[in-house]
Amino acid sequence: MDQSSNLTGKMLIAMPGMRDPRFEQSVILICAHSEDGAMGLVVNRPLPEIGFSDLLAQLGIQAGANALDIPVRFGGPVEPGRGFVLHRAPREIELDENRMRITDDLAMSTTRDILEDFARGLGPQPAMLALGYAGWGPGQLDSEIRENGWLTSDRGDEIIFGAEDAGKWRAALKSLGIDPLMLSPDAGHA
């Protein structure tokens, strides 16, 4: 794969007619993309049945009076019991081995210590916690894009970290100048 086709740090926007109901009207941030496959987090599927404070309690983390309440979302169907914190991380901040830099100013963390920081009212902002992730094998994502399953766009932090999950899919399409009502689920290839 050449560097120009690398989608790390980009967003995927599900096309109408997405065959997999787990990804219907999904917006996904691609966290890693290489010849070995791809990994991303769905950013617009809230998990209303579990709040951040509930999750802290389940993990035995005591929330302080100044605890931050970050959104908890369905990140994807792979490893749904594993948490991934997507957060700002300015370039000048050194990341440890359990944190992965996605772009110059965005990282993903999988450590308990970041959850403890949020429980104390610390931690990077904006942030979101995703349970599970979306994964693709070698060439699989590229094939799904060619088959008209996904649109790609530059990252939009207002879409990723914005408050209204229900409108994120439409907002992502509109950021590309696309009216969702004008999209066809069928692709044409010459």
Curated annotation (Swiss-Prot):
Coiled coil: none annotated. SUPFAM superfamilies: VC0467-like. Belongs to the UPF0301 (AlgH) family. It comes from Paracoccus denitrificans (strain Pd 1222). Transmembrane segments: none annotated. It comes from the Bacteria. This is UPF0301 protein Pden_0436. Pfam families: DUF179 (PF02622). GO terms for cellular component: cytosol.
